């Protein structure tokens, strides 16, 4: 499947991806071009054993991998996200990433930015995934 051209010459993706990207519990929703909750798949990372597994027919929890450095942590999270996206998308997709929350303070804001920066860089390197950032106030 490829992206269809609109009358204005822009392309419409067949797979829409919503990403709420955090350090502790990032989540991804994979949807077709016509949203139907029952046809979506929802994926999240967790450190809590009770939240690992399948819930209903379309919600999946995955365990965080262990890490030794912050960069290893960020790489693990972005690898998980890209694996989920590539497994569940069609040929081309459009991802929407929730932007940064300005409520974050101190060292956390830098880790959040570095984490998301790695994901955005890796998405940019994937020719079949376009992405946009959506500010939290409109989500």
Language model features by range: what are they?
Residues 2-139:
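Phosphate- and other anionic-substrate recognition elements at nucleic-acid/protein interfaces
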